[in-house]
Amino acid sequence: KMLKLSEENEVDMLNGYPLVNHGYRTSRKMMTHFDKPISLRHGTPDARLLIETALASGIFEIEGGPITYLLPYSKNFPLDKAFMYWKYVERICANYSKLNEPINRESFGPLTATLVPPCITIVIQLCEMLLSLEEGVKSFSVSFSQTGSMIQDIVTANVLRKMAKHYAEQIGCGDAMINLVYHQWMGAFPSNKDYSESLINTSTVIASMVRADKIITKTR
């Protein structure tokens, strides 16, 4: 509906690219044209068709999970169904990885994009990582977002990286590649430009200190 309205009014009314609507043929042409790595970030608890289309389009990084893409976006969706649907996603990614480069799965660490206790973030990240690795995924990214405390963020990164490696080895998946993603501040930004600049710069320093494999940036 929103795609149709956008075309009729010649105004973009979509929050993102309608991948399923355009289909894999059109999307693959676009991916080939730009020749840049694309990460799928969507926000749906049932991503089965979306993931199939994404992989056929040439997208090799899939964000989300049964918890991190359920609680922040779809509070009325059944949790057990979300786990069942994402288990299918993990198997698809694992099987496709056998034919090509490993599909990187990434959990959405910021959760509700508000201040979440690091212990909750870490436990949820580990749960989604284990679900993914148990289905055969060989590349997984755990993540979390800036909290406002440099010390807390550094400790969170160290614990998350250490625990992820530990539990991956516990289930016989020590050969999996585990990456760390750091999200810059996900909450409301200060109205003062200098304060906002300081927030962005501080998060960049933290990402460097924890040696994040990827940083989700905020534009100025």
What do these predicted ranges mean?
Residues 146-151:
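A generic structural motif
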